């Protein structure tokens, strides 16, 4: 099979709106979590979120942006960055059937779904809904709103698999490359951040509510006093490219994607089984002949999910566990965008030789004892890194990325 490498990165997140800002935040262990007046005013119990600190007004042509939700906007801006980072000219990717795009979101756009329904019930009816709500609200809005303005002629579709969405998009892109169907695939996703989305998670008791007065402390993966995840938004895109194609054009190669796992728990709609995660990591590691130096865990700061994943890691690695950190303690949980964002965080650590910390661990959960959980920024040369992304419905994705070797 052909080999797939990553040659470009683009990101808009709660800890930075480009690669340089994100890198600085990762090194400093800087939290992107803030107080949300919007969530408080909506009547929610959780008043904290990982918001994007960026005014996107005027950043995208109005004829393009009129079709977009925030999820699509974040993914579009990320794709612009990734293309520039990869050194791709328009001639290299536009109108080219060998260049495709796979990008999604976990929740579509609840904001525009609600807007459309509310407008329809109002006095103006359909006129108030307008012609652009469909592309903003539809589940495939992210891929549609990127493929059209970027003139993509290859594959073009969304994957939606809850919090594993954009990791699955990357994995599927790798498979397109391996099978020889595409030379380049832009892969990733975006997620909007709004009360209309957040309230659904608050209603099921999944969000943090104890730290509204200290937002930067609310996301605390592996801490004994964690009480739920902090919802976040943003986007990310990577350029997945066939190795020989990348070498031929002299591209900078961040890493080769040497492993991809995708499994289902088939056990519970919300609670992870752990067994599916074990199979997923083992699948991703199959044929990988170098040890995993660093694992970016799914680690969302939920009481059950965190320790289920750690138990799975123990089963997979035994007494040879890699260094582990959960970047969601800094960023919050961006749902469908989390997979690609955390792949990018892992790639930046691989590129720059360090491990970002799991912050806010004041009292380590006893079920995390004995594992190499990194709580301070650590300089270390890395060769092979793993990123886990798991979601409701028992969906699992694992990516293994390695510095290129012959």
From Swiss-Prot:
Its main location: cytoplasm. GO terms for biological process: fatty acid biosynthetic process; monounsaturated fatty acid biosynthetic process. GO terms for cellular component: cytosol. Changing residue 329 to V: In strain: M5 / fabB15. CDD domains: KAS_I_II (cd00834). The keyword Transferase applies. SUPFAM superfamilies: Thiolase-like (SSF53901). Its EC number is 2.3.1.41. Keywords: Acyltransferase, Cytoplasm, Fatty acid biosynthesis, Fatty acid metabolism, Lipid biosynthesis, Lipid metabolism, Transferase. Induction: Mainly activated by FadR, but minor repression is also conferred by FabR. The active site is at residues 163, 298, 333. GO terms for molecular function: 3-oxoacyl-[acyl-carrier-protein] synthase activity. It catalyses: a fatty acyl-[ACP] + malonyl-[ACP] + H(+) = a 3-oxoacyl-[ACP] + holo-[ACP] + CO2; (3Z)-decenoyl-[ACP] + malonyl-[ACP] + H(+) = 3-oxo-(5Z)-dodecenoyl-[ACP] + holo-[ACP] + CO2; hexanoyl-[ACP] + malonyl-[ACP] + H(+) = 3-oxooctanoyl-[ACP] + holo-[ACP] + CO2; octanoyl-[ACP] + malonyl-[ACP] + H(+) = 3-oxodecanoyl-[ACP] + holo-[ACP] + CO2. Pathway: Lipid metabolism; fatty acid biosynthesis. InterPro entries: Beta-ketoacyl_synthase, Ketoacyl_synth_AS, Ketoacyl_synth_C, Ketoacyl_synth_N, PKS_Beta-ketoAc_synthase_dom, Thiolase-like. Homodimer. Belongs to the thiolase-like superfamily. Beta-ketoacyl-ACP synthases family. This is 3-oxoacyl-[acyl-carrier-protein] synthase 1.
């Amino acid at each position: 099979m052909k080999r797939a490498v990553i040659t470009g990165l683009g990101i808009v997140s709660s800890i930075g709106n480009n690669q340089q800002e994100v890198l600085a935040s990762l090194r400093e262990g800087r939290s992107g979590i803030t107080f949300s007046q919007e969530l408080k005013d909506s009547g929610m119990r959780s008043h904290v979120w990982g918001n994007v600190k960026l005014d996107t007004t005027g950043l995208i042509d109005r004829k393009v942006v009129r079709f977009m939700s925030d999820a699509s906007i974040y993914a579009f801006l990320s794709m612009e960055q990734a293309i520039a980072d990869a050194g791709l000219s328009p001639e290299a990717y536009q109108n080219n059937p060998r260049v495709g795009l796979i990008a999604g979101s976990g929740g579509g756009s609840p904001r525009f779904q609600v807007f459309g329904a509310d407008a329809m019930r109002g006095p103006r009816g359909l006129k108030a809904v307008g012609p652009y709500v469909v592309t903003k609200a539809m589940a495939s809005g992210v891929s549609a709103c990127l493929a059209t303005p970027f003139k993509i002629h290859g594959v073009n579709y969304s994957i939606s698999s809850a919090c594993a969405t954009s990791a699955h998009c990357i994995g599927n892109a790798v498979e397109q490359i391996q099978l020889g169907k595409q030379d380049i695939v832009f892969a990733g996703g975006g997620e909007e951040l709004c009360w209309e989305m957040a309230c659904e998670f608050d209603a099921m008791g999944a969000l943090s509510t104890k730290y509204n007065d200290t937002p930067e402390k609310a996301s605390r993966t592996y801490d004994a006093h964690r009480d739920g995840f902090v919802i976040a938004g943003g986007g990310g895109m990577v350029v997945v490219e066939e190795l020989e194609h990348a070498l031929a054009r002299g591209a900078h190669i961040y890493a080769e994607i040497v492993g991809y796992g995708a499994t289902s728990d088939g056990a519970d709609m919300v609670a992870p089984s752990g067994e599916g995660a074990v199979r997923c990591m083992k699948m991703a590691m199959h044929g990988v002949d170098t040890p995993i130096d660093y694992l970016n865990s799914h680690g969302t700061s939920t009481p059950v999910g965190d320790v289920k994943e750690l138990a799975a890691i123990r089963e997979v690695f035994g007494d040879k566990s890699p260094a582990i950190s959960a970047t969601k303690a800094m960023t919050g949980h961006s749902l469908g965008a989390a997979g690609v964002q955390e792949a990018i965080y892992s790639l930046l650590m691989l590129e720059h030789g360090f491990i970002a910390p799991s912050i806010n661990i004041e009292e380590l959960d006893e079920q995390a004892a004995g594992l190499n959980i990194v709580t301070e920024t650590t300089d270390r040369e890395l060769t092979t890194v793993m990123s886990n992304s798991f979601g409701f419905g028992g969906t699992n994705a694992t990516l293994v990325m390695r510095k290129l070797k012959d």
